[in-house]
Amino acid sequence: MIFSQGASPLKGDFSKIKFSIASPESILAHSRGEVLKPETINYRTFKPERDGLMCEKIFGPTKDWECYCGKYKRVRYKGIICDRCGVEVTTKSVRRERMGHISLAVPVVHTWFFRSVPSKIGALLDLSTKELERIIYYEVYVVINPGEPGAKQGIKKLDRLTEEQYFQIITEYEDNQDLDDHDSDKFVAKMGGEAIRLLLKSIDLNETAIHLRKVLKESSSEQKRADALKRLKVVEAFRKSYEPQKKTRKKAVGLFPEDELPEPYVFEGNKPEYMVMEVVPVIPPELRPLVPLEGGRFATSDLNDLYRRVIIRNNRLKKLIDIRAPEVILRNEKRMLQEAVDALFDNSRKANAVKTGESNRPLKSLSDALKGKQGRFRQNLLGKRVDYSGRSVIVVGPELKLHECGLPKSMAIELFQPFVIRRLVERGIAKSVKSAKKLIDKKDQVVWDVLEKVIDGRPVLLNRAPTLHRLGIQAFQPVLIEGKAIQIHPLVCTAFNADFDGDQMAVHVPLSQEAQLEAALLMLSSHNLILPQSGKPVTVPSQDMVLGMYYLTKSRPGDPGEGRIFYSDEDVLIAYNEDRIGLHAQIFVHFNGAVDQKFDPLRVLDTIVDPKSEKYTWLKSQLEKKTILLTTVGRVIFNQNVPDSIGFINRVIDKKVAKELIGRLSSDVGNVETAKFLDNIKEVGFHYAMKGGLSVGLSDAIVPDTKVRHIKNAQKDSTKVVKEYNRGTLTDNERYNQIVDVWQKTSNIVAEESYQKLKKDREGFNPLYMMLDSGARGSREQVRQLTGMRGLIARPQKSMSGQPGEIIENPIISNLKEGLTVLEYFISTHGARKGLSDTSLKTADAGYLTRRLHDVAQDVIVTIEDCGTTRGLHVYRNIEEETSGQIKFREKIRGRVAARDIYDTLNNNVIVKAGEIITEELGDLIQETAGVEEAEIRSVLTCESKIGICSKCYGTNLSVHQIVEIGEAVGVIAAQSIGEPGTQLTLRTFHQGGTAQGGISETETKAFYEGQLEFEDLKTVEHSAITEDGVEEIRIIVVQKNGKINIVDPDSGKILKRYVVPHGAHLHCNAKALVKKDQVLFSSEPNSTQIIAELHGRVKFADIEKGVTYKEEVDPQTGFAQHTIINWRSKLRANETREPRVLIIDESGEVRKNYPVPIKSNLYVEDGQKIVPGDIIAKVPRNLDRAGGDITAGLPKVTELFEARIPSDPAIVSEIDGYVSFGSQRRSSKEIKVKNDFGEEKVYYVQVGKHVLANEGDEVKAGDAMTDGAVSPQDILRIQGPNAVQQYLVNEIQKVYQINAGVEINDKHLEVIVRQMLQKVRVEEPGDTELLPGDLIDRSAFVEANNNVAEKVRVTEKGDAPSRIQEGQLYKTRDITKLNRELRKNSKNLVAFEPALQATSHPVLLGITSAALQTESVISAASFQETTKVLTDAAVAGKIDYLAGLKENVIVGKLIPAGTGLKRYRNLTLTGESVETISHDASDDASTQNGI
C-alpha cells in the first residue's frame, strides 16, 4: 500500500487511499533497519536482542524516553540516537508504527499473486498454476532465453526442462556459458522465484495487450478467445495502475524539478516483477507482541514464529551460498525459504500448513489477521471497544418520563468521574485530582450533589444487543437511582425488543459538544416515536397499559348511574370520585367539539333510556344536533389526556386504536405533545389495570357445550370420506385432503364458538376475553388451543415426497384446559421442540442476511435534491390484494413524489400535481376516489443520480413525515428495516406450538361486491351429471385456463373485483347477470387440477401401457381399479421414447383433440369409451402445503430473492408473444414451440414429467410461464427488462413479509436494495472503448466510457499525416478535421477516418453478496468477504478508494459522509446579526458558596 510521505501513514487529512504492489524500494523506504537474527528477547535479561525481531535499534525503545543501554533517560534527550546502543530516544508508541525488513538471499514469489484465482502470474506468463508451482518450488527449469542452443534444439521461451534435459544442453554447449547474460544468443534457463522474476521483467505490457486484443478480434476458436480474455484482464489491470499516476505527474512536473519529484509522483505504476519479492517487510513489534505470563513463560503472536522460520532459513541459505554448497542442497533450502515466506503471508491456503507444537493448530499468518470475524477489519476497525461505558441488568421504571432512564448512582459516578473531579477541583472542594478521587471513594454527600449538577442536561446513550435497527440505541436523560439495575421506560421496550427477564443494556456517555447535541436532538427517545421501516408508531402501549385503557373505556350495561346527563367533564369526574356513578356507566355529557366515534348513539339510546319518556325525546333531538355526547365515565377520564385538537375519542381503546391515535398525534401535534400524551396514558393504563384487578383464573377459560356435537359430526363426515375412498370414487390423495378439510373446518367452528362464549361471559368482562380483545396478550389461536381443540398438527419429518408441510390427519381433539391424552401430548411435543430449535438456528441466518443487506447498501446516501429524471414507477390499485389484507394503494403512494399529474378520471380533475409530495391526507383522498386507478410516482429504482440517490426519488423520511434530507443514509436504514423483521420472521414459528393452520380448501367462490357480471376469455361446455339424490342436472363447466369473471359497477362501468376461474370449475351464474354480495359464482375442486373433454367422440389411449407408463392399483375391499401414470423413463431402452396422452377421435378415426397426461395423474376414462364435453379425462393431484405458519418458507425465500438465485426447478418462460404448439417428443424431453404473427418461432425443451400449463393453440405473452415451477428473476430480466424484474423482486419479497409474518415494510426500502442489485452492466461488444468483452462495470462507468469515445474518430488510412498519427488509433474529431484542412491546403492525401464505435452492454442482476463484493470501494469489499482476493485484485490494478461510503470511513477512522458528517456541513461558519450577553447566574454563585 502506498502512502504519502511522513513519519506515520494515515495521519492528517487525506481523501483517498491507493492500493498497489509494494516495490522493493518502497519496502526499504518504510523500513528502519534489517532484521538479521531470529531471536526475540534475551532469556536472562528479558530485553530485546539486537538485530532480532524485537530489536530496539530498528523498532524503537521499549520504555518511554529511554535507550536500550540506559545512557539516555528522560524526555530532555528527545530525538538523540545513542552512540552506544544505536536506539533513538523517543516514546515507546513508535513500536506500533516502525517497520523493518528481511533481505532475502533469493527472490521469492508472493503467494497471493500466484495462488489467487485466476493466478495473476499465470495469466501474465500464460502458464497453468500446476506448471507455475513446479517452477516456483524448484522442480523444473523454465527457459528464459532459448539463445542459439535453444534454436538448434527447437526449444522456445517458457518451455519447461527437467534437470537431465537442462544439463544435457549445458554440457553440449559449454562455450555458451561464457557469453554475457544479456547476449541474445546465450541459452538461459532457471528455476524458482528468480526465474519468474526475470520472465515477468521481460514482459512488455503494451505489446501483450495489443496481441491479446488481436486474438480476441480475429480468433475463431472459442477456447482461445476465452483464454486471451482472461489474460487480457490481468494485463489491463497492470496497465491501468499507471493511468492515475500520469495525471498526477502532469500536475506535479510544473511544480517541482524533474529529479526532485516527491515520492508519490515518482511511483510509476505496478511492475509485474514486484509480484516476486527480494525484500520481506517486517511489521512493527507491538502488532505481534510477546507478552510475559506468570510462571516465567511467554505468550507470543504466531507471526513471530513465522518470521523466525523465514529468518532462520534465509540465514542458512546465505551461509550455504557462501560455502558454495552443492546445487541439490541449495535448491532444497531455496524451496524451504519459499515455503516459509508463503506460510508467513497466507498459511491457511496451504494443504500442509505450518502448525503449532502443543495444540497442533495452523499458525495465524498475515492474511488470517485480516480475514473473517476475528480479523483486523471486523474485529478492530469496524467494532471497537468503547471507553466511558458500562452495562447492567434492566428493570422497569414506570414512574419515569419517556425521555428519562434510571441510572444507578454507582454506575453514574464511574462514568462521569472525570467531570465530577473537575467540578470538585474547580469549586475548591478538593485541592487536587488525588483528593477528589478520595472524596469520590468515600461516597461523600457533596459528591452526589455535584454528580446531580454534572448529569443535568447531559444525555446518555442506552444500547441493547442485538442492535438490529437504529432504535436499538437511544438517548435518555439520566435520573440517579439507588440499586444496581438500570431503569427504562416501559414504552421504549418495543423499540429495543427488551423485556425484564434478565436482559442487559449498555450505557455510553457522549463526550464532545457535537455528540451531546446530536444525542439530544436526534437520538432522544421522545424524538423516536415512529418506526423508520413503515412510518407507524413504535412507542405503543402494550400489555398492562392496553388492558387498563381497554377496561377503562369499555361500557357495561346497567352500571350505577347509567343514563344520567352531565353538564361538563368536571361534573362527571366529581360524581365518579364521590362514588355516585360506575366507571363503565353509559352517560350523556354536553359537548360541542370534534368527536371520533364508530357507532350510532341513536341506535343504542332506547337500551339506556325508556323510549316513551320525555327524556328520550329530548336526548334524541340533542344527539341529532350533536350538542350532547353518549359516552362512558371511563372515556371521559381517558379523554382528559387527549389534546383538544384531536377531539373526543369516543371508542373502546384497544391496541389498534391506541396505535392509530399515536400516529395521528405525532403527525398533527408533534413529538413533544405526543410524548406527554404517552406518559399520561401509561399512568392511566397501569392505574386501571390495577384497579380492575384483571388476572386470569382457570375458570375464565370456558369450553363451549357444543364441542362434543361438532366432533361427532366431524367423525361421521370423515367416516363417509373413507367409505367413498373404499368404493373407489376418491383417490388416496383426495381422501387425505378431504379428511384434513373436515377437521380443519370443525376446529375453526369450535374455536369460533369458544370465542363467542368468552365474549358473552360476564357481559364481556371476562379477563381472558379482555386480554385477547384488547390486543394486550394472546391471540385467537391460543384461545382455540385453551378452550376449543388443539386441532391438526404438522407431521414431524419431511414426507417421502419431500413435502415438508404434511399434516397428521388425526387431530388433537382435547384442549389444554381439559388436558391431553398421552398420545396427543406426545404428538404435540414435536411442534413445541421444533419451534425452539428453529428459532436458534434461524436467528443466525437472519443476522447474516442483515449483514449482507447492510454491506450492499451502505453507500446509498441522499446526495442531491433532484436528479431531474422524467421516469417514474406505475402503481396500480389492486382490489384483490386490498381485500386479502395486503398493502393498500394508499400505502404504496403515500410519502412519494408524483412523477406525473394524478387524475380523477370520473370527475376529470387533478388531485396531485407532478412534483408534489403525496401526503397522508392526499393518500387517503386518492384511496377513496374511485376514479384514480393508477399513479406514476418517483422511485429510487428510476433515480438517475450518479452518486447515491436524490431526495425527490426517495420521497419522505418515514420517521418524520417530511421530505428526506440530503445526507440521510437511506441504504443503512433500508438494510435495517428489512433485516430487523427478518429475525422476527424467524421467531414466529414456535408461538403456534407446531399446530397446522393452513387455509381450508374453499370449494365455493362468492361475490365480494354487488354488481353486474362480465365474462372475459371464458370458454364453457354444458354437461349433464347425476347428483347424489339420483337427479340429472345440467352443469356449466369451464374448459379454458385463466378465464376471468369481473364484477362491474353497473353505473360507472368500473371493475370492482376480478376472479380467475380455474380450469374445470362449475359455474353458478350467467354473463351480464346482476349478483348480490356473497352469492356463489363458481365452485371448483381445490385438491386437484382436472383435464376436461371439450368435444364429443371416443377415447383412444396413446403410449398408455400397463406396467410401462401406468400402474393399476386395485382396492382389496372394493375391487375398484385406479389407473395412475408413472415415471416411465427408467423402464425404456436407450433412444426409446413415450408420451402418454389421451386422444379424442371421431367416427372416422381422425384425431380431434390431443390431451397429454402428466406423471402422477389419475385416469378417469377407459380406452374406447364414448365421451361428451365436460367429462373428466384425468385429475392431476395438487400437493397442498397446508402446514402454513412455519417461516421455513419465509427466510430462505427472502434470501433466494435477494441473492437472485435461479430456483431449483424453474418454470419455462416464453420469450415472445405468440401461440403454443407441441413439437416432437424425445426420450427425456418434449418440444414446446411458440410462434408469433411475424413468423418468429422459439423452441423450448421440457423435461418429461414436468406439468405443462399451456395447451395446444393457447395464446401466451412474453414472460408467461408455460410449465409449473417458480419463475427465475434472471428470465424476467432477459425477457421483460430491468423494470419488470425490479417490480417482481419488490412484490415477491413484500409477499413473504406480509403473508408469513404480517410485517409491514415500506416499498422504498426494498427498492433501495433492488436498485443496488441492478447497478452493474456486462459489456457485450467493447467497440473502440478501453472496456473488455464480459467486463462487469457500473452503469455510470459504462456511460462515461462511451462518452469518452463519442467525440472521437478512428483513423483507417493515415494519408500524408505526420508520424504521430497512427492507423487504428483514436483521435478527437476536431483535431483530425483541422489536420485534414491543412493537408487539403497543401494538396496532400487526407486522413481517412470513421466514427469511433461505442460499446454495447446488457443489464446484470447480481445477488446481494456479489453486489457487495463488486462495490467500487476496495476497503468496503475487503471487510465484507474474500479479503485476500479483493486486496490482491485492487493492488494489481492500482485501485484508488475515494472513501465515498460509510464503511470505509469508519475503518480509516474518519467521520462518515452522511448526516452531520457530510462535507458540506464540516466547515460551516456561523454569522449573527447581534450578540446577546447572558447574565451571570446568581444561583450558580450561591451553590458555589454552599460548597457544591
From Swiss-Prot:
Cofactor details (free text): Binds 1 Mg(2+) ion per subunit. Binds 2 Zn(2+) ions per subunit.
Cofactors: Mg(2+); Zn(2+)
Pfam families listed in its UniProt record: RNA_pol_Rpb1_1, RNA_pol_Rpb1_2, RNA_pol_Rpb1_3, RNA_pol_Rpb1_4, RNA_pol_Rpb1_5
Ligand binding (Zn(2+) 1): C67, C69, C82, C85
HAMAP family: RNApol_bact_RpoC
Stated role: DNA-dependent RNA polymerase catalyzes the transcription of DNA into RNA using the four ribonucleoside triphosphates as substrates.
Protein name, as recorded: DNA-directed RNA polymerase subunit beta'
Taxonomic source organism: Chlorobium phaeobacteroides (strain DSM 266 / SMG 266 / 2430)
Organismal lineage: Bacteria, Pseudomonadati, Chlorobiota, Chlorobiia, Chlorobiales
Annotated gene: rpoC
